[in-house]
Design a protein with these regions (language model features):
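N-terminal start-of-chain detector that recognizes signal peptides
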Residues: 6, 68-72, 104-108
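Active-site rim loops that border cofactor/substrate pockets in soluble metabolic enzymes
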Residues: 1, 37-96
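Short beta-strand segments
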Residues: 35-36, 99-101, 135-136
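ATP-dependent carboxylate/acyl-activation modules
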Residues: 1-32, 40, 56-58, 111-140, ...
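Charged, alpha-helix-enriched surfaces in structured cytosolic catalytic cores
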Residues: 14, 46, 106
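Short active-site-adjacent structural elements
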Residues: 76-77, 105-110, 142-143
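A C-terminal functional module that forms or caps the active site or interfaces directly
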Residues: 91, 95-97, 101-116, 120-124
């Protein structure tokens, strides 16, 4: 498993599926938004094709969680846009944001952490089958404790599933 610089549409769909699984483990209903500079094809560019294709892959797989995209971050998070996009259950309600690449994810994470009053936990490594988290440089004590808590919780889930198999 690797962290993808620029994920393919299949990798983006897999990231969404793995993210939904983690969100469910924490007791929440996943509402996944694929983020972009474009909102639902306006403007339609080559850069957004992977995101649109990932959404189609998830539709074909008939996954058991809500998702939509591509959309800009404000559309994903601010309910005032529901009137403009009434066809989407995700607009204004997203609790998972899938970025089009590692660079945009890193920039967005640092911006949220620096400018937001909301507690940001992460970045989380998902899909490794092990409770591994990496504390970024300049992590606070609180950040490290949150990542350790996520790893401990993940470990208990992984151990529980392994015991059920045996």
């Amino acid at each position: 498993v690797t962290v993808h610089e620029i994920p393919t549409s299949e990798q983006l769909a897999d990231i969404a599926i793995s993210s939904a699984r983690v969100v469910k483990l924490f007791g929440y209903e996943p509402k996944i938004a694929f983020l972009s500079h474009s909102t639902f094809g306006t403007p339609k560019t080559k850069a957004t094709k992977n995101l649109r294709d990932a959404v189609e892959i998830l539709k074909d797989k008939k996954v058991d969680f809500k998702f939509d995209g591509e959309m800009q971050p404000d559309v994903a998070l601010d309910s005032k846009y529901k009137e403009l996009y009434p066809f989407s259950e995700i607009v204004g309600n997203a609790n998972v944001l899938i970025m089009p690449g590692r660079h945009s994810a890193a920039i967005s994470f640092k911006l949220l952490k620096s400018l937001s009053a909301v507690k940001v936990v992460g970045p989380l490594l998902i899909g490794l089958g092990q409770p591994i988290e990496i504390a970024p440089l300049r992590s606070s004590t609180s950040d490290i404790l949150n990542l350790a808590s996520v790893a401990a919780y993940s470990s208990s889930i992984i151990n529980y599933k392994n015991k059920k198999k045996n």
